[in-house]
Amino acid sequence: MLVLGIETSCDETGVALYDSSKGLLAHRLYSQVDEHAMYGGVVPEIASRDHLRKLLPLVREVLAAGGVRRTAIGGIAYTAGPGLIGALLVGAAVARSLAWAWSVPAIAVHHMEGHLLAPLLEPEPPEFPFVALLVSGGHTLLVEVRGIGVYQVLGESLDDAAGEAFDKTAKLLGLGYPGGPALARLAEKGRAERFHFPRPMTDRPGLDFSFSGLKTHALNVLAALPGTPQDKADIACAFQAAIVDTLVLKCRRAMRETGLGRLVVAGGVSANQAVRKGLQAMAESERYRVYFPRPEFCTDNGAMIAFAGCWRLRAGQFEPSAIEARARWAMETLTAV
């Protein structure tokens, strides 16, 4: 089955073609970073308008790159949530319109399920069951995964997600947008041992996260200093180390509690090299296997949506023609495949 995937949950427009027998045929991604940089963050109205401007040209480009005629498309998958509601509606409307025009079924895909399944696009994919750490700008989740759609959330962020904490702290340090990658680059020049940042919620049982206090701690440390470039680099390094240590501890705890031996790490923050190294070191010491998507599939993309949608469409799951978009959507409500 050949599926067209559409991703428009935030500020990146992703389109891809996935074939159930041949794999990923083509994918394209348009980032709106330059459009939002002057505002220091994503402006929802601008994001929606830019998706509308770029989506159909990207669809045509992907079809051409994949050497596919529209008559070969067997279904369309689109991100229906969670995300920015205006951006989601653009993708949903285009996907539903194309599905109607081409007389093919369409399936609404959960954005975080797309991230969770992204490592399955790799040459050596993980086998079920596994524990998944989904770590992005909007979410930080630990999930026990027994199959596609068989999810139990073990822990989640009670306030800021890890990626959100990266972006907010980067803004405090006067870094540009997107803040997470900028902070990671600055941290390479810093000394983590100069400042002690707390490891939130690691001194108690449970698998939930809380990262908002790290931003406040960074603000207080910065306020007591001259704010030299080295001061900021050291703060960035200590902040990042606190995030990494917290993620590592919670993942180790989740693996021990579930008794599973495979860990999947996905979402935008999984591209962070310090996060990868910390989790890889933990996995090696504990004799677990850890899986990451390639960097281009860590951030939002159409390939993961096409892949997730293909599994569900092949299982006979699709919705009527109503346009579906949800700003919030619990993973545990998804149907098993």
Curated annotation (Swiss-Prot):
It catalyses: L-threonylcarbamoyladenylate + adenosine(37) in tRNA = N(6)-L-threonylcarbamoyladenosine(37) in tRNA + AMP + H(+). Its EC number is 2.3.1.234. GO terms for biological process: tRNA threonylcarbamoyladenosine modification. Keywords: Acyltransferase, Cytoplasm, Iron, Metal-binding, Transferase, tRNA processing. Its cofactor is Fe(2+). It is found in: Cytoplasm. Pfam families: TsaD. Gene3D superfamilies: 3.30.420.40. Coiled coil: none annotated. Substrate binds at residues 134-138, 167, 180, 272. InterPro entries: ATPase_NBD, Gcp-like_dom, KAE1/TsaD, TsaD. One of its GO terms (molecular function) is N(6)-L-threonylcarbamoyladenine synthase activity. It is an enzyme of class 2 (transferase). Required for the formation of a threonylcarbamoyl group on adenosine at position 37 (t(6)A37) in tRNAs that read codons beginning with adenine. Is involved in the transfer of the threonylcarbamoyl moiety of threonylcarbamoyl-AMP (TC-AMP) to the N6 group of A37, together with TsaE and TsaB. TsaD likely plays a direct catalytic role in this reaction. This is tRNA N6-adenosine threonylcarbamoyltransferase. It comes from Methylococcus capsulatus (strain ATCC 33009 / NCIMB 11132 / Bath). The lineage of its organism: Bacteria, Pseudomonadati, Pseudomonadota, Gammaproteobacteria, Methylococcales.
